[in-house]
Amino acid sequence: MSDMTVKDFASKVGRDVSRLLEQMQEAGLPHKTEGDAVSEEDKQRLLEHLTRSHGGDSGATKNRVTLTRNTKSRIRSGDGRGKAIDVQVRKKRTYVKREPEPAEEKAAEETGPRQLVGDMASANQAKADEAAKAEQAAAEQAAKAKAEEEAAAAAASKAAESEPVAEAPGAPQPEEPETASEPFVEAPPKEPRTPNRRGQNHQKKDTGRGRKRDDDEERRERGERRRGNAKKTKRSERRGSRRGGGRDNQHGFQKPTQPIVREVAIPESISVADLADKMSIKANEVIKAMFTMGAAVTINQTIDQDTAAIVVEEMGHKPKLVKDDALETEVLEGISYEGEEITRAPVVTVMGHVDHGKTSLLDYIRRTKVATGEAGGITQHIGAYHVEHESGDITFLDTPGHAAFTAMRARGAQATDVVILVVAADDGVMPQTVEAVEHAKAAGVPLVVAVNKIDKEGADPDRVKNELSQYGVISEAWGGDTQFVHVSAKSGEGIDALLEAILLVSEVLELKAVPEAPAKGVVVESQLDKGRGPVATVLVQNGTLKRGDIVLAGLHYGRVRALVNELGKRVEEVGPAMPVEIQGLDGTPEAGDEFIVVADEKKAREVANFRQGKYREVRLARQQKAKLENMFSQMGQDEVAKVNIVLKADVQGSLEAIRGALEELSTDEVKVAVVSSGVGGITGTDANLAVASEAILVGFNVRADVSAREIVEREGLDLRYYSVIYQLIDEVKQAMSGMLAPEWKEEIVGVAEVRDVFKAPKIGAVAGCMVVEGTVYRHKRIRVLRENVVIYEGELESLRRYKDDIGEVRSGMECGIGVKNYNDVQVGDKIEVFDQVKVERSL
């Protein structure tokens, strides 16, 4: 064996050579290759190492032995049926041999009584051995002799009780072995939890009779205690006996001595349940804290970032505001706009008051008839046009001048380089003119004032300069920095000078763009075309937009299927400062959204989905919350009349303007609720929604399809088409006026003065009166005034003149008046006759 190598040793023990080498190195042996020799000493060291690593002790395993005994018996029940019950008793005992203690220490520790107890234990051990032998010999005989007496107990234990049924011998059991076994059963601390390891060395019993008897006594006592607790199962009893009852395994949680302060990461919107989870507290505690702060919320309600930060600070933690735009930032940072820069055409927005000639001026420049195509002769969309001039190219954006299109004008100012402010020379500065000036200043865009209609009678250009100077727009002739150009959209006077002024301002701005970069820009308008799907009018501000590019615009994305310029022609690519219609998006983006071209469609979809989820969360967070200060005001909202409207428009910008104008019409008595709004024709879904919500179907420059018309005719819905925003708003106002509660106005029709009072047998007190004002009518409401103080209000019961009942008495005539249910009429009182008139209200 001394010449055995590692390889031979591995094949002998059935181990892999590499694994055996690892174990030998862990044991501290110097073997590294399979050819190294293995001695008997090396094998012994390896065996001791493996024994220790498997939770055993090389010395302790020799001092512990586990014996298992199975005893089978059969008893018959005493109920007369002759039923036999098989009983199997399993016994498992582990014996531990203590290491002998030094005689000197034992002698020093033991006292006189201890020695006496030891002598008694040794004397009683012989008796215990004899009793154990007698018990083992008579076990089966005693079981058969007392089968009928133990049948009930065996059935109660369900024939599987861990305590043996037949183990009830009549031999006397001495009590002393419990005390006598104390010097022998003191085991290592692991004794209460009896191990059952595989591969454990079993040894023969040497002196285990007395200890076995003591274990049986303890086992019996534990069994009696377990039988007293009927709630424990057999499995838990066996587990408890194996684990020693859990008396030594006392575990528990300790309460923190100081409050734990956590750093809570808060996104832009978070639900109450998620916020409580981040702070490791219950959600009802967060709800209570917010209730004390004046906000009543539910567990699933979404709150914004600022509110959540206040709540976290109130709960004693540190808020950490987190931005959720990491994915967007990653996509945007991957786009490079570096390259050779070129001078691009300026983007010019035409703004001004309605009917001041903005579109007509642009029409003359383009040499086309645009205004005649607009309903009512007013612009209701943002039109984007590219004009080639001999001095340079210019891109024009025509914005509406109506008051409802404030948001569209603001978007036009943000997407532009120069603003042309059109002011009629005969009309002067109007509200939308001032608003356009404010938009231009807010966007930091230079102004060029075009004083239009200069050829009309009554034109006063100096008046325009004077009025604009009050708003900070100073002419260059007056020492300012704003160019004023006198033009006429009808005759074309001053058009060239206006274009030269625009190009001059653009040269000063030094407008640059990188045509080789991916395109980016702004969405000017969007609509849902029945044949083409979602169509977005965009203005390219930088880069080049090509057919096939992947575009991310607001909440939507898609691959560009077609590019159509303002002339209706399809093009393959569009450069900077050029307007174009794109097809291929999965929806209609909001007007004013920025668009970019990304390289990866998967990234674009992820960003779009993230924005949609974020938009939904923010919208839910901004909804009206049930706060304490407005609870009472919300209680009376059910009594308010409501006009429900399902609105469909042709383009996104008009839809937004109309929706805002309708919501502004709401009053304290009548609310306008836009139940649903969208771009495109009226469908059957819209009609069904109008039926469910009892709403008016309104189409702005759109029509209903066949299914929608069938539902409208069947249900009798109110469907209205409009092409001018004036008419839409006026008719909604009329509908709201019809829902207003009418006013009742009191109108005094006559006054009579009491001259005398006399008694009538059937009526009672009758006032003899003189009509001093108006006409007194019978069966109308009256008031009795004494010294101009109302003392009674009731009804005129009888009206007579010379014993004749009459219907009315005019001024200057005498009459007798009987007041219903009132007899305290005195001379000098005045009787005032009035009528209630219904007055229709209007907004």
UniProtKB/Swiss-Prot annotation:
Xref: InterPro entries: DNA-bd_dom_put_sf, EF-G-like_DII, IF2_assoc_dom_bac, IF2_II, IF2_N, P-loop_NTPase, Small_GTP-bd, T_Tr_GTP-bd_dom
GO molecular function, one term: translation initiation factor activity
Keyword Protein biosynthesis: yes
Pfam families membership: EF-G_D2, GTP_EFTU, IF-2, IF2_assoc, IF2_N
Region feature (G4): 452-455
Protein localization: Cytoplasm
Chain intervals for the UniProt region annotation (G1): 352-359
Region called G2, residue ranges: 377-381
Annotated Polar residues bias: 60-70
Biased composition (Basic and acidic residues): 29-55, 96-112, 203-227
Span list, region Disordered: 26-260
Binding site for GTP: 352-359, 398-402, 452-455
Gene3D superfamilies associated with the record: P-loop containing nucleotide triphosphate hydrolases, Putative DNA-binding domain, N-terminal subdomain of bacterial translation initiation factor IF2, Translation factors, Translation initiation factor IF- 2, domain 3
Region (G3): 398-401
Segments for region (G5): 488-490
Keywords: Cytoplasm, GTP-binding, Initiation factor, Nucleotide-binding, Protein biosynthesis
Coiled-coil portions: none
Domain annotation tr-type G: ranges: 343-512
Predominant cellular place of this UniProt entry's protein: cytoplasm
PROSITE patterns xrefs: G_TR_2, IF2
Biased composition (Basic residues): 228-244
Family: Belongs to the TRAFAC class translation factor GTPase superfamily. Classic translation factor GTPase family. IF-2 subfamily.
Protein's UniProt name: Translation initiation factor IF-2
